[in-house]
């Protein structure tokens, strides 16, 4: 550990300033010793504060307002974001740790890259003094005095610049940006259309004054072709209903009565094609045919699990009906 520096070596000729000691856990004993010595020698008009550098870098706390003097009791190299967080025109004292002469060159280069100015002479061989760069001032634009305006001289503002009009870009580039057809597709994208895209949509007129629009029906002696369109639409609807009934009729765990459903031999649970159109639901609840258990109070199979038509039902004494 280097020899301790007397606190009077860090006195500021410009007046009292807040002294902040930034330390780390790697150099905790040196940090505590310097903080104690500065507090014992500080005049009543100045204050000495201590803070861990990680709290400053993590924005857990902020630096005191200027005027400010910062003591860095940190291992080398210094954290990359520390130098940029130091306020302008702030004097810093870097307390060099022992056996770190090989890293002094990189330290001076880092300080010079951030425009820190060295302060000579240094308080001690183990302490470096630097001053952070001052805040940049706003540039002032000097303007020549303009003559008094007259009736023949146009009035212009001092320091005004001529208005720069934006020139039109390449017209071919703009046209390609908004083009509908792509040169990458030879047919202009027509091959990407599906049969559903090519189908002409139905013309449905919206309701007026809240009254629904009635659909025009074909006459008995229709000759305009509307009757054929209605028949084709009804055929498509009927085919869709029959297709939807297939999935229902092919279920083998329903309980439709036997007089409405007769399975073919060897294909139990499969309805014959001629019986599918004749089958209708007769249940009041509509759940028994969907494979649900018998739950209606008037059902003779109340409490039994669903079974297939034609299956022999055996109820044991232990069953709770």
UniProtKB/Swiss-Prot annotation:
Positions bound to [4Fe-4S] cluster: 285, 288, 296, 299
Example of a GO MF term: 2 iron, 2 sulfur cluster binding
GO cellular component: mitochondrial intermembrane space
GO BP terms: iron-sulfur cluster assembly
Composition skew (Low complexity), residue ranges: 139-156
PANTHER family: ANAMORSIN (PTHR13273:SF14)
Protein name as catalogued: Fe-S cluster assembly protein DRE2
Species this protein is from: Cryptococcus neoformans var. neoformans serotype D (strain B-3501A) (Filobasidiella neoformans)
Taxonomy of the source species: Eukaryota, Fungi, Dikarya, Basidiomycota, Agaricomycotina
